[in-house]
Structures are given as C-alpha cells and as structure tokens.
C-alpha cells in the first residue's frame, strides 16, 4: 500500500511539472513572437527617434536559434514526463487491481 501511495504522489508531481512546462512553452512562444515583431519593425524605415527607441528593446546578442532550441528541449522534456506519467499510471492501476483481487 505504501508503494501505491508513493506512486500516486510521484504521479501528481509529474502532472504539476507538465503543467509548469506548458506554461514555460507558452512564455517562450510569446517571447519569440515579440522578438520577431520587434525585429520586423526595426527592418522598416521610420523616423530616427522611433528606431532608436525600438533598438533599445532589441539586444545585440539576439539569437533565435537559442530560443528555438530551448523551446524544443521544453517540448522533449514534456514528452518524456508524459511517458513516465503513463508508466506510473499503469503501475498504479496494476497495484490497485492486485490489491483488490
């Protein structure tokens, strides 16, 4: 019974982690969209003052590859956690059936 409770506890923790990773993924996508928007606006010629203000928003070391790589790593981690969740859920169901019968 103690093993079953530990498995349920770990399963709940994995579900919470998956929720946090989904939030992180949304934030990364939103940040990527904002950076692309700033980059597109900077490419258009405007008055000097407006471009200077927008250049303050754009860092010099802007690298979209790093952002996309972190987004891919977040998605991969989410898939791995879902697989672990399904294995633990199967184990919990198995232990419950063994206990009942």
Swiss-Prot record:
Q: Which GO terms describe its cellular component?
A: host cell membrane; membrane
- Give me the segments passing through the membrane: 81-101
Q: Which one Pfam family would you cite for this protein? A: Corona_7
Asked if Ion transport is a keyword of the record, the answer is no
Keywords on this record?
Host membrane, Membrane, Signal, Transmembrane, Transmembrane helix
Looking up InterPro entries in the UniProt record yields:
Corona_7
Query: Signal peptide position in this chain?
Result: 1-23
> Membrane topology per the record?
Single-pass membrane protein
Report the locations given in the UniProt record. Host membrane
What family is it from? Belongs to the coronaviruses ns7/ns7a protein family.
Question: What does the UniProt record say this protein does?
Answer: May function in the formation of membrane-bound replication complexes or in the assembly of the virus.
Q: What is this protein called?
A: Non-structural protein 7a
């Amino acid at each position: 019974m103690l093993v079953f409770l530990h498995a349920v506890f770990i399963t709940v923790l994995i579900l919470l982690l998956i929720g946090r990773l989904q939030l992180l993924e949304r934030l990364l996508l939103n940040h990527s969209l904002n950076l692309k928007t700033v980059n597109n606006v900077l490419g258009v010629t405007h008055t000097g003052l407006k471009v200077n203000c927008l250049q303050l928003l754009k860092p010099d070391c802007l690298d979209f590859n790093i952002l996309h790589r972190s987004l891919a790593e977040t998605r991969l981690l989410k898939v791995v956690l879902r697989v672990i969740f399904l294995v633990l859920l199967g184990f919990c169901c198995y232990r419950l059936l063994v206990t009942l019968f």
